């Protein structure tokens, strides 16, 4: 496999790196600034919850489909979350049709981990009959435009879609589950959690790398943070190392930025 770093023109790599080492970026942002963000919910009429998020030119649509099914054997009293990501070929020339590749699998796992480990959804409240009937939440992520930093956009879109989701009341009568679609209710949400991704370029770490910056990074770290400021997920990428100071700096910035993102999310979802 050809290393991407080998085919990026040296002049491009050097110009971006020199700017960042001088505390500047090619799109005019500061080192620790997100691109413009927009959030829409209720964008898929056939889904019980959905969202469209744009982070710069990166665009993701997420749909949530609840279904009654069996719990996992080791958690018979808890509902189930299943996450699937589709990297549509129209989103990037590097995305190919066919079964999920390692990037799609990694994206699904990172989003799932951030939602699950943050305990965002109270899965015990999604249990209908312990050991046999629970709500299963199918999360479908569709990347329709890729311009860098899928993780942050995907987590934001997934959280927005979950907050938008309504499920019918489910009652047990004579051992059978009866669904009442006249009583739609929100998911049992404990808290919100979002993610901040950083790229190591030159001597600096930069927040929310664009595609051009991703192409030349030496290392990447994504940090999931709850609204209370607890770390709930972390993912390292790239072939290069990160120093202890790099990681601590990234964590500090993420803990500062996530409450701001959550405030923006809450405002975006207010009717």
Curated annotation (Swiss-Prot):
InterPro entries reported for this sequence: ExoRNase_PH_dom1, ExoRNase_PH_dom2, ExoRNase_PH_dom2_sf, Exosome_comp_Rrp42_subfam, PNPase/RNase_PH_dom_sf, Ribosomal_Su5_D2-typ_SF, Rrp42_archaea
Keyword Cytoplasm tagged: yes
Keywords: Cytoplasm, Exosome
Compartmental location: Cytoplasm
CDD domains named among the record's database cross-references: RNase_PH_archRRP42
Transmembrane residue ranges: none
GO BP terms, alphabetized: rRNA catabolic process
Disulfide partners: none
Gene Ontology MF terms in the entry: mRNA 3'-UTR AU-rich region binding
Predominant location category: cytoplasm
Any Gene Ontology CC annotation: cytoplasmic exosome (RNase complex)
Similarity remark: Belongs to the RNase PH family. Rrp42 subfamily.
Subunit structure: Component of the archaeal exosome complex. Forms a hexameric ring-like arrangement composed of 3 Rrp41-Rrp42 heterodimers. The hexameric ring associates with a trimer of Rrp4 and/or Csl4 subunits.
Function: Non-catalytic component of the exosome, which is a complex involved in RNA degradation. Contributes to the structuring of the Rrp41 active site.
Protein name in the entry: Exosome complex component Rrp42
Gene that this polypeptide is encoded by: rrp42
